[in-house]
C-alpha cells in the first residue's frame, strides 16, 4: 500500500466520521451487494445457438469493434479478464442462447446439461449465476409474438422454453448455493394501431401461469418478469406493459424487473423502487443507460445510477433487490464496457453507503429542507474516492484508470487475433 493511499484513506475516515459514517462498515456492506454482470455484452447478444443469425426482438447492438467472443471459451476468458478489474462480489447473468452443445438443441428442449460448463466455471470463480429464457432471434418469434402468440402451437413452444429455462435456473441455484434469478422478457407487440389489446394479454397471463406452475425451491430459483414501453417494430403496442407485469408480479408474488431503459424517457426507475416494494416480494434491476430510447449504452456514474443505488441503501433493501446490468455497446472494447459499467454501479453503491442517511431523514422529518439540500450537496465533496481506492486495493484490483492498460494488453495479445 502506498503512503499516498494510506494518507488519503486516513483523511477520508476522519472526514466521514465527522458526519457519523463508519467507512469500514460501509465497505462491509458493499461486500454484501453483488452485481450481476450480463454475458451478452461480450458478443453483442449473438449467443452460441446460431452466432451468425440476426438479432431480433426490437433490440440492437450497434458498432463493429474487433475482437468479440466467438465461443464459450472466449467469452469466459473475456469475463475473467473483466472481473479481475472489478472489486467485490459479482454474479453472471446468462441467456438461454449461450448453451453449449455439439448438436443443435431446440429451445424447448434445453436442459441443465447444456450449461454444465458454465456451472463448473462459476464454481471455480466463486460466482452465482442468473438466467433468462431467450424469446427472440428465432424463427418462431419472427412475427413479433411468443408467449402471447395466437397460434397455440407456437405459444406452447415458448411456454415449454420458459419451463425448461426455469429448471436450468434451479439447477444453477442448487449447484452454486445461491438462488438464480430468472427473468422473463418477451418482445411481443405491434408496430401500428392495435385493435384488440386485450386478447394477447389474456393469452400472456395464461401462458405465464403455466410457465410458473411447476413448484421450484425458492432457495434455488426466483421468477422475475420484465416490462417494456416499446421496441423497434413494436412502437404502438407492447403486450407486456408495466401495468401488466406490476399486476402480475403483485398477484402471483413473483419478482418484478425494472429496466432503466424500458420506460418513457421522462421516467426513472429509481422513483419506482419504493412503490413496487410495497407490493412485490423482490425486485430485479436492470441498470442501463437509455439515450433517447432503450439504447443500452454503458452505465455511467450519473444522477440516475446514483439515485438507484441510494434507494437500495436508504431503505435497506439489500435482501430484496437483485442488481443486474443490461447494456451492450459494440462500438468500444467490450471488456472495457463491462469494467466501466460495473465499476460505476459499485461506485454508486459505495457513495450511497457513505451518506449520512439518518441525519438527512431527521432534517426531512423536521421540515428543514434547506439543511437537507445543503447536506446532500456537501456530501458530494467528501473524499469517497479515497474509500473506493482502498476497497479496490483490498480486492487486488486497480484503483484508478490503470485498469485500462490491462485491457489494452489483453486486446493486443488476445482480442486482436480473433479477426
Curated annotation (Swiss-Prot):
Enzyme Commission number: 5.3.1.14
Gene Ontology MF, one: manganese ion binding
Transmembrane segment boundaries: none
Secretion signal, residue range per the UniProt entry: none
Recorded GO CC terms: cytoplasm
Catalytic activity: L-rhamnopyranose = L-rhamnulose
Cofactor note: Binds 1 Mn(2+) ion per subunit.
Cofactor(s) it depends on: Mn(2+)
Keyword Isomerase included in the entry's annotation: yes
Enzyme class per UniProt: isomerase
Pathway of action: Carbohydrate degradation; L-rhamnose degradation; glycerone phosphate from L-rhamnose: step 1/3
Biological process annotations from GO: L-lyxose metabolic process; rhamnose catabolic process
Biological role stated in the UniProt entry: Catalyzes the interconversion of L-rhamnose and L-rhamnulose.
HAMAP family: RhaA
Similarity-based family: Belongs to the rhamnose isomerase family.
Protein name: L-rhamnose isomerase
Amino acid at each position: 500500500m502506498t503512503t499516498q493511499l494510506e494518507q488519503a484513506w486516513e483523511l477520508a475516515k476522519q472526514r466521514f466520521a465527522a458526519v457519523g459514517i463508519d467507512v469500514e462498515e460501509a465497505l462491509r456492506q458493499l461486500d454484501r451487494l453483488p452485481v450481476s454482470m450480463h454475458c451478452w455484452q461480450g458478443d453483442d447478444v449473438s449467443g452460441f445457438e446460431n452466432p451468425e443469425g440476426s438479432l431480433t426482438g426490437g433490440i440492437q447492438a450497434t458498432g463493429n469493434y474487433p475482437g468479440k467472443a466467438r465461443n464459450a471459451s472466449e467469452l469466459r476468458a473475456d469475463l475473467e479478464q473483466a472481473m479481475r478489474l472489478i472489486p467485490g462480489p459479482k454474479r453472471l447473468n446468462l441467456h438461454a442462447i449461450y448453451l453449449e452443445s455439439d448438436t443443435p438443441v431446440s429451445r424447448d428442449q434445453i436442459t441443465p446439461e447444456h450449461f454444465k460448463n458454465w456451472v463448473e466455471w462459476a464454481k471455480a470463480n466463486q460466482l452465482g449465476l442468473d438466467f433468462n429464457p431467450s424469446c427472440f432471434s428465432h424463427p418462431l418469434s419472427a412475427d413479433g409474438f411468443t408467449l402471447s402468440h395466437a397460434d397455440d402451437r407456437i405459444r406452447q413452444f415458448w411456454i415449454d422454453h420458459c419451463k425448461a429455462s426455469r429448471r436450468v435456473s434451479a439447477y444453477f441455484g442448487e449447484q452454486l448455493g445461491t438462488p438464480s434469478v430468472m427473468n422473463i422478457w418477451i418482445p411481443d407487440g405491434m408496430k401500428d394501431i392495435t385493435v384488440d389489446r386485450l386478447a394477447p394479454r389474456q393469452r400472456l397471463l395464461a401462458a405465464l401461469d403455466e410457465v410458473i406452475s411447476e413448484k421450484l425451491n425458492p432457495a434455488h430459483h426466483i421468477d422475475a418478469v420484465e416490462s417494456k414501453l416499446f421496441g423497434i417494430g413494436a412502437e404502438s403496442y407492447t403486450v407486456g406493459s408495466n401495468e401488466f407485469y406490476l399486476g402480475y408480479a403483485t398477484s402471483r408474488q413473483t419478482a418484478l424487473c425494472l429496466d432503466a431503459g424500458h420506460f418513457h424517457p421522462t421516467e426513472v426507475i429509481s422513483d419506482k423502487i419504493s412503490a413496487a416494494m410495497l407490493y412485490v416480494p423482490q425486485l430485479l434491476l436492470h441498470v442501463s443507460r437509455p439515450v433517447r430510447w432503450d439504447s443500452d449504452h454503458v452505465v455511467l456514474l450519473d444522477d440516475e445510477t446514483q439515485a438507484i443505488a441510494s434507494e437500495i441503501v436508504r431503505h435497506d433493501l439489500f435482501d430484496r433487490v437483485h442488481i443486474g446490468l443490461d447494456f451492450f455497446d459494440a462500438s468500444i472494447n467490450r471488456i472495457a464496457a463491462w469494467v466501466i459499467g460495473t465499476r460505476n454501479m459499485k461506485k454508486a453503491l459505495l457513495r450511497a453507503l457513505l451518506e449520512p442517511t439518518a441525519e438527512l431523514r431527521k432534517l426531512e422529518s423536521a421540515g428543514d429542507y434547506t439543511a437537507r439540500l445543503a447536506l446532500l450537496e456537501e456530501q458530494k465533496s467528501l473524499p469517497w474516492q479515497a474509500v473506493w481506492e482502498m476497497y479496490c486495493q483490498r480486492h487486488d484490483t486497480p484503483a484508478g484508470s490503470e485498469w485500462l492498460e490491462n485491457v489494452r494488453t489483453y486486446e493486443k495479445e488476445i482480442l486482436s487475433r480473433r479477426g
